[in-house]
Amino acid sequence: GKVEFQGKKTKFDSDDERNENGAAGPVKRAREETDKEEPASKQQKTENGAGDQ
């Protein structure tokens, strides 16, 4: 299922740029859900051991 998560991450990555445009609300929420499902994404974003949480 890593491939599926990677695809999702790419989608969020694209939305991340739009998120700065003023869509931080929905995008941030979706990202949080993804982070919970794939800790690897969180690790790459924070690299602060967030994957442990």
From Swiss-Prot:
Region of interest: Disordered: 1-53
Phosphoserine: modified positions: 14
Major location category of this protein: nucleus
Keyword Transit peptide tagged: no
Gene Ontology MF terms in the entry: RNA binding
Sites bearing Phosphothreonine, chain numbering: 10
Annotated protein name in UniProt: Lupus La protein homolog
Organism: Oryctolagus cuniculus
